[in-house]
Amino acid sequence: IQCVPAFVLDAVERPEPLDAVVDDLETRADAVDHFEFYWFPHTATALTKTNTRLPAGTATRPLTATSRLVDDVLVGNVVHQSVCSAGRAAPGLVPGINRLSARVWGDRTFSDASHRVFATSRGVRFREMEYAVPLENLASAFRGVQRVIDENGWHVEFPIEVRVAAADDLWLSTATGRATGYLAVHRYWKVDPTAYFAAVEEVMLVHGGRPHWGKMH
């Protein structure tokens, strides 16, 4: 196993205008160590996460226990579970709920050991599909997913995750031979994801996508 020395991550999580983030994806990815964002369908907001590596031993500013409880447990799990249940019972509520979710999630700055920043607790059950596309195709692929959601009138209650990674030299890696953008779509486990995932998969394949082997595809 190839490992690196322990390190600290400085994390900046904030909402930003979606179009500006998508239009500048490659530049944002090249400028920092780790960049990703979440997008709740039916909103115009990207919930960005920018992580910068710092040497081990750097003084940290970790989240307080109260902040973790409110953000990660109450909002990220308890409230989101209620939101997903409500969206399944009344799909027409989803756009409004998503707009509210985009306003209350993802606005904080902190630093801590990498494993405390990267890892998050997920208590809401879901199904997921993720594809890896060449980084230069990521913005177009994302726009394609937006289009299929709009064209089909789907009310999607779970956010889409977009992240980037450097090229790899391992044959079985989804990033082998190319800088890569990852696009993951999710549905609440009580919602049939078949049509949504199939439509997204068509978009990914057009953009040179490779499926994540451990997820639905």
Regions found by a protein language model. Name each.
Residues 1-217:
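Noncatalytic alpha-helical scaffold of FAD-dependent oxidoreductases
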